Each structure stands twice: as C-alpha cells, then as structure tokens.
Amino acid sequence: MPELPEVETIKRTLTPCLREQKIARVEVYHPGVIAAPDPETFSRLLAGRIITGLDRRGKYLLVHLSGEYCLVVHLRMTGRLVFTEGAAPLAPHTHVVFSLAGGPSLRFVDTRRFGRLYLAAKAEVETLPGLRDLGPEPLDPAFDALALAAILAGRRRPIKQVLLDQRLVAGIGNIYADEMLFAAGIDPRRPAASLNHEEVARLRGAMQRVLEQGIANRGTSIRDYVDGSGRQGSNQEHLQVYGRTGRPCPRCGQPLERVRLGGRSTHFCPRCQV
C-alpha cells in the first residue's frame, strides 16, 4: 500500500503536470471505485473544472478544483494515478480516465480495485470516512516528542501497532513502521507506554529521518507503486530490515527476524532493538 512518502511523491510529481489544467471529460470504466457520488454525477460535476492544486493528508491525495468541489483519492493496496501525454493505449486495470484539455490525461489504475475516489464539497472533505478520524501528520513541525509521548501514554498495544493506527498518527504503514523502529533501536513488540522519554525522542527523530528519506528516494517500489509520471521509486534499495528476514542486521550482523503483530509481518533485529 502506498504510504506517506509514496503519496507525497505522487503529489509532487503530479502538481506541475496538473495545476491549471482543465478537465474536459471523465470516463469511468469500473463504477465500483467511485465511492461518492454516483459515477454519472461524478463525471458530470468534474467536467469543465480547473485543477488548482494538490495536497496530501495521511495516505489520501486531495485534488483541489475550481468551484466548490475537491477530488479525494485513496489508493489503498495497488492504486496508481499516472499522468499520460497524448492518446497512449490504456494500461490493464485502468478504471477511470480524466481527459484534460489539449490531449493529456490522468489515469486511475488499480489491479485489485480496492482504491476509492470521492468527489466532495470542499467544506465536507474533512468529514469523509477515514479522513475525519486521521491523527496528526508525523512531518508536521508541531508533532514533536511531547506530542508523540502524549499519544503513547497509557497504551498497552505494541508500539508497531500504535504507529500503524491512522487515528493516532497519519500516513505510516508497514514498511516505514519497521524501518523507523529499527532506526530508533526499539523492539516493535514493546508496549507503547513502556517507552521512556529518551526512547520517545529517539523514535520521533527516526520517524522524521525515515519518512524524509523515503520521499527523497521517491518512494518504495516493491510491487505496484509508481509515481505520478509512471516511474518507480528507489527507496527499496535502502531498506534496513523490511523484507530482509534471515539476512544479517546492517548494524550488528545478527540475522533479522520476522513475527506477526496484529496480522502484519514485522521485521526487526532481536539484538539491536530492545
């Protein structure tokens, strides 16, 4: 699933391509990916609108439009948003095409069809399911060690599961949770409330470094992810623990281990992470 760095990269690659572009028409090939309104109304309301900018909130992409509407995209597991010049053939699993004035298009492609598109009034975007309950942005300067400590206080769940809870912190998924816990030297199975002040500060710093590295490397392409231009990211070449079960820890040489936490594979070093 695209996480914060991937959605941020998509936003940054699409913004110069889409800003001030006019949507000429919208073709929906698989109605199930349109969450709201109905596909016919979705297409009709989008036609003729100007794209004024893009934002990200957690793992959601917000496409701001002229008038009173905003397009909200949640890519889920395998969704892609790709800007395409000219009349290139449709890729397999293309479900929505936003044709832009002058010939280019924005295409929503999703192998598993879990992704969802919403067209909502701007005043109602923050009340959409999923968005309304999102926690703070981990790269927000206001999200400091004190803010993280307040989230962890009193929580007995494993720290890994707390980091994945979008209601507590927005945008973190399985890959980056494993990487930031390794960077901080914290066992993912530890109760969140057991972290002391020094460990919380260390984790806060690791969160920022790991997420910023993911963005600098244009995201992690392990299976489906590509950016808004259709290019893969390179952060998979820099992963320290995720997907490296049995290989030597890059820090101490101990074989890395994998366990299941909350139904998710979790990768860590049994020696370095305590």
UniProtKB/Swiss-Prot annotation:
List the molecular function annotations (GO) for this entry.
8-oxo-7,8-dihydroguanine DNA N-glycosylase activity; class I DNA-(apurinic or apyrimidinic site) endonuclease activity; damaged DNA binding; zinc ion binding
Entry's SUPFAM superfamilies?
Glucocorticoid receptor-like (DNA-binding domain), N-terminal domain of MutM-like DNA repair proteins, S13-like H2TH domain
Top-level taxon: Bacteria
KW Hydrolase (keyword) present: yes
Which reaction is this enzyme known to catalyze? Hydrolysis of DNA containing ring-opened 7-methylguanine residues, releasing 2,6-diamino-4-hydroxy-5-(N-methyl)formamidopyrimidine; 2'-deoxyribonucleotide-(2'-deoxyribose 5'-phosphate)-2'-deoxyribonucleotide-DNA = a 3'-end 2'-deoxyribonucleotide-(2,3-dehydro-2,3-deoxyribose 5'-phosphate)-DNA + a 5'-end 5'-phospho-2'-deoxyribonucleoside-DNA + H(+)
**What InterPro entries does UniProt report for this protein, alphabetically?**
DNA_glyclase/AP_lyase_DNA-bd, DNA_glyclase_Znf_dom_DNA_BS, Formamido-pyr_DNA_Glyclase, FPG_cat, MutM-like_N-ter, Ribosomal_uS13-like_H2TH, Znf_DNA_glyclase/AP_lyase, Znf_FPG/IleRS
Oligomeric state and interaction partners are given as: Monomer.
User: What's this chain's function?
Assistant: Involved in base excision repair of DNA damaged by oxidation or by mutagenic agents. Acts as a DNA glycosylase that recognizes and removes damaged bases. Has a preference for oxidized purines, such as 7,8-dihydro-8-oxoguanine (8-oxoG). Has AP (apurinic/apyrimidinic) lyase activity and introduces nicks in the DNA strand. Cleaves the DNA backbone by beta-delta elimination to generate a single-strand break at the site of the removed base with both 3'- and 5'-phosphates.
Q: What is this protein called?
A: Formamidopyrimidine-DNA glycosylase
Mind giving the lineage of the organism this protein is from?
Bacteria, Bacillati, Bacillota, Clostridia, Moorellales
Gene this protein is translated from: mutM
